[in-house]
Amino acid sequence: MHTLNIKSTKELKEFFRYKGKNTPVISGHRGGMVKGFPENSIETFENTLRHTPAFYEIDPRLTKDSVVVLMHDATLDRTTNGKGKVSDYTYAELQQFRLRDPEGHVTDYKIPTLKEAILWSRGKTVLNLDRKDVPPEMTAKILTECKNDIIMITVHTAEQAKFYHDYNPNWMFSVLVKTEEAFAEYVAAGIPYSNMMAYIGPENKPENKILLDMLHAKGVMAMISAAPTYDKLPNAAERAENYRETFAQGVDVLESDLPIEVSEAINDRR
């Protein structure tokens, strides 16, 4: 298994620090989407790590009885053999359902809890918690209970980042930064450069160079998400070329539904 051997928050910050010429970093969007393996499942996280080192963007959601599970959609219909809203079921009731793979086939895998995922990730990878319907206070409490600070939290505003930073100054953030002004707001809120990785959008545009240079000057890595763009290209060769080009243009982290493909693409040309 290709693990990310990160043992402390100091090592976590060092891993995500821009150092001039970085090794490309791969983020599996919802863990990755491969036949036989459902999104947002521990089994999928493990499968991806069999092929490539990666960290994962995941989607925490609340059940009816306030258990936090992993589920992107507000409803069960697309990714499980259940129907209706996640929030209409207790955690115990959700255990009757099984997850579907990207092609819609029902697997043997159950819906995991956020706690299960965080505890599993220790010594293996980093989980990046996206924002869904879980109150920040509850997220912070669960992270504290799990005693695993080797995590990342997606935030869309400086105010959101400040809440978590005040709660635990060790936590890393994936910050939404599409302009220099947006980045300045995080800095003004007291978020250290070392606690940030910047998500700059779904494609690498020429006008991003100024933003990339500014982030890199502060030691902050920049991430592009290929899920809504390059991942949708019709064939593997086109996708591979765009993955390689994204890194060649200075992006440090590529988030993708197809992390194994990304790894194969960039390793073919080294």
Residue positions per predicted region:
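Phosphate-group recognition and catalysis centered on beta-loop-alpha active-site segments
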Residues: 1-270
